[in-house]
From Swiss-Prot:
Top enzyme category: hydrolase
Family annotation (CDD domains): RuvC (cd16962)
Gene: ruvC
Entry keyword annotation includes DNA-binding: yes
Protein name, UniProt field: Crossover junction endodeoxyribonuclease RuvC
Length: 154
């Protein structure tokens, strides 16, 4: 099984690719799709879709896991929701089964505690994937946690 985990955003979309082979989880790739704030929003959304398509074509995942948001009066809400919609559409274009998880469920799945801080989640991700250096930037590390959640809760 190969899964892509995605941490949505307009400025930065984190992604992480993990293989699960006979119960062992192996990090294949992780990184970010970054868009410049100087571009028009519609150009940034197209860039996210195009870059995500390239990642999907390169790594050919079997499924996807995406962080689900619940916003309350945030100025970034609309932009992030639009980016998330483009991400969901792009995943759908490749007919990938999609799992969605809120942040607390991701923390619970990865650490066993739904109110864990970022360092606890990061340590568990590094341990589970047998990696010695923290994935950078944080969005990529978060995407790996989302992918692990997709594996654990499949």
């Amino acid at each position: 099984m190969r899964i892509i985990g995605i941490d949505p955003g307009l400025a930065r979309v984190g992604y992480g690719i993990i293989d699960e082979i006979e119960g062992k989880k192996i990090m294949i790739d992780c990184g970010i799709i970054e868009t410049k704030s100087t571009k028009k929003e519609e150009e940034r959304l197209v860039e996210i879709s195009n870059d995500l398509s390239s990642i999907i074509k390169k790594w050919n995942p079997n499924s996807a896991a995406v962080e689900k948001f619940f916003f309350y009066r945030s100025s970034t809400t609309i932009s992030v929701v639009q980016a998330r919609g483009v991400i969901m559409m792009t995943l759908g274009k490749y007919k990938l089964p999609i799992q969605e998880f809120p942040p607390m469920q991701i923390k619970l799945a990865v650490t066993g505690y739904g109110h864990s801080d970022k360092n606890e989640v990061l340590n568990c991700v590094m341990h589970e994937l047998s990696i010695t250096s923290p994935p950078k930037p944080d969005d990529a590390a978060d995407a790996l946690a989302i992918a692990l959640t997709g594996i654990y809760l499949k």
